[in-house]
């Protein structure tokens, strides 16, 4: 159990780094973790792969909230700082330093693939290869999230540069069901209207979930 004194569980160094500090590789109130959790099975078995795992938010939440019956959590990442962070807190059973789009797994060997806020950091060509690789290795479910709007690179943060944008049609043509989150508008730290936009983001989510063409982010789910 996480400690609860002196400010609650956010005093725990892992939780503080994942949720509180504005460091890439963690999360923010605008990220789709509740929706990822909704589509993640309650009981997990076999290999669970988190592509571009960052600081391990997906792996951390899976360990907290799911029954792992012989499941093996595997993270793929290329950033050494993130890799060391995940190893320090034992978030994954195995973490592999592996650039995308190629995946180091056998055909139909992975039960669940998470690819959250990753594909937009690849070129269009690389992203299509990644989708082919996911089809090759996954035998269970794949969950992909990506912005439904192109974001400019934040100053001083070239690693987070967006190189492509993906549409509802791109995913549906490959057999994914697509849902929406938020409202299609730019959301950037430092925007003087950010709080208003955040409120609109939450307010419109029940609508954009059903009509993803107006959403700020897409969540694509495919069962194999």
Role assignments for model-derived ranges:
Residues 133-137:
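Conserved helix-to-beta-strand junction in the class I
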């Amino acid at each position: 159990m996480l400690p609860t004194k002196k400010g609650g569980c956010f005093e725990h160094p892992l939780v503080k780094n994942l949720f509180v500090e504005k460091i890439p590789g963690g999360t923010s109130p605008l990220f789709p973790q509740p929706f990822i959790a909704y589509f993640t099975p309650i009981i997990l078995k076999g290999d669970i792969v988190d592509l571009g795992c960052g600081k391990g938010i997906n792996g951390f939440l899976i360990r907290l909230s799911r029954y792992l019956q012989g499941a093996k959590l595997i993270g793929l990442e290329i950033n050494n700082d993130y890799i060391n962070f995940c190893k320090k807190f034992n978030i994954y059973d195995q973490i592999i330093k592996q650039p995308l789009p190629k995946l180091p797994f056998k055909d139909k060997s992975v039960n669940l693939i998470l690819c959250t806020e990753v594909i937009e950091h690849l070129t269009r060509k690389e992203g299509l290869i990644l989708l082919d690789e996911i089809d090759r290795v996954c035998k269970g479910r794949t969950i992909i999230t990506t912005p439904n709007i192109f974001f400019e690179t934040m100053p001083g943060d070239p690693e987070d540069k967006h190189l492509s944008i993906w549409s509802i049609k791109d995913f549906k043509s490959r057999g994914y069901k697509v849902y929406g989150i938020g409202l299609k508008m730019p959301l950037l730290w430092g925007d003087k209207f950010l709080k208003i936009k955040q409120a609109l983001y939450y307010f419109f989510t029940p609508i954009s979930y059903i009509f993803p063409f107006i959403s700020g982010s897409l969540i694509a789910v495919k069962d194999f």
